[in-house]
Regions:
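An alpha-helical repeat/solenoid feature that recognizes helix-turn-helix modules
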Residues: 1-142
C-alpha cells in the first residue's frame, strides 16, 4: 500500500494535464484501493509487505495511509464516492483535540527489508492535504 497508495495519491497532477480518469489503469488503481479499504473507511499497510507480498494493503490504520488512499480515490472517482466519504470521516473522527493525528507506525520505506523511516510530519501533512482537496472539490461542485 505504501508505494501503491502513495502513487495513486499523486494522481491529481494527472487530472490537471487532462489525463482521462476513466483509463483502465486508473480504474484498476481505484478498484485496488477500494479492495483494501477497511470497513471503517481507513487504510493501513505494514512494512512487512516488502517481505510478504500477501500482506499488501493490510495492517493497522494510519492517518497518512488513509489520506493517500483517499486522495487516489478522489482523483479517480470524485468527492461523492462512498469510499472517499468514509475515508474523510475516518480522518475527522481520528483527529486529536489539538487537531492533529497520532501515528505510531513507520510508513516510510527507506530501503525495504533493511530500514524504514518515520517521517514525523506525514501524520499531519497528508491528512490535511486530503481534507483540503476534499473541501476544494466539494466547493467546485457546488459552484457548478
Amino acid at each position: 500500500m505504501a508505494a501503491k497508495a502513495f502513487s495513486t495519491a499523486a494522481s491529481p497532477p494527472s487530472m490537471a494535464v487532462g489525463e482521462d480518469m476513466n483509463r483502465p489503469y486508473i480504474l484498476r488503481a481505484a478498484a485496488w484501493l477500494r479492495s483494501v479499504q477497511k470497513t471503517d473507511g481507513s487504510f493501513g499497510e505494514t512494512c512487512q509487505t516488502y517481505e510478504d507480498h500477501s500482506l499488501k494493503g493490510q495492517g493497522d490504520s494510519t492517518a497518512s495511509q488513509t489520506a493517500w488512499g483517499a486522495m487516489g480515490l478522489m482523483a479517480a472517482a470524485g468527492p461523492d464516492d462512498p469510499a472517499v466519504i468514509k475515508a474523510m470521516q475516518w480522518l475527522i473522527d481520528h483527529q486529536t483535540p489539538a487537531g492533529d493525528w497520532t501515528e505510531e507506525y513507520f510508513t516510510g520505506t527507506g530501503f525495504p527489508k533493511v530500514f524504514y523511516l518515520k517521517y514525523h510530519l506525514y501524520r499531519l501533512y497528508f491528512p490535511l492535504t486530503a481534507l483540503s482537496r476534499y473541501r476544494r472539490l466539494l466547493a467546485i461542485r457546488q459552484r457548478g
